[in-house]
Amino acid sequence: CRTDPTAAKHKGISILIVDTRDPGYSWTPIILSDGAHHTNATYYNDVRVPADMLVGEENGGWKLITTQLNHERVGLGPAGRIAGIYDQVHTWASKPGSDGVTPIEQDAVKRLLGQIKSIWRINELLNWQVAASGETIAVADAAATKVFSTERLQEVGRLAEEIVGGYGNPADSETAELLVWLDKMTKRNLVITFGGGVNEVMREMIAASGLRVPRVTR
């Protein structure tokens, strides 16, 4: 909340912990496109918070917010998300289908799996770069990791569905289950493109903070 109304817009902000038992606090669930419920919209009506619920320094909230956002952006871009899709599809493709054909023996399947694995490895390098930076993560590095991973995840989902949908038989129970899982992952992974800040804003942050390009005038 703003604790110094006279300060500049990024100053005078403090973080306070709100007791959710306060009668002025309420929430409603946010249901995602895949039907999952991971987060909520919260509301504060005449909520009063004791001063001893302050987190960190008074008027020092913006630094905490930006630090948390950097960690959130990195957390939204782990290589493990892509690795999980690759492992599931690679395992499926390595088994003979109901027609006796093993999908991974097809050149097109090998090529598509290779594309997924190359994206996975690049994402790993970005993760390692951020991990090597220590406690202080550069804004541009966190944003770049998030943009690359969340957008490449959409591509990985399409490639995976192309493999399973194109070289599998949906009448086969294992293939059908994998297609349902991939569909859920595709919908769920779309949401993270705007978690921690939409990617259009992330690109501006990369340009301004990482490349020192003048900020866009608004």
Predicted regions and their residues:
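Glycine-rich beta->alpha junctions and the first turn(s) of the following alpha-helix
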Residues: 19, 25-123, 192
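Tryptophan-centric aromatic hotspots in well-structured domains and transmembrane helices
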Residues: 15, 39-43, 62-65, 92, ...
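Glycine-rich phosphate/cofactor-binding loops in nucleotide/flavin-utilizing enzymes
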Residues: 62-71, 75-79, 164-218
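Short, glycine-/Ser/Thr-/acidic-enriched flexible segments
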Residues: 4-6, 21-23, 32, 48-49, ...
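Short glycine/proline-enriched turns and hinge-like loops at secondary-structure junctions
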Residues: 8-12, 56-57, 198
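C-terminal helix-coil-helix/basic helical segment that borders enzyme active sites and/or dimer interfaces
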Residues: 94, 98-104, 110, 120-175
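A short core secondary-structure module
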Residues: 1-28
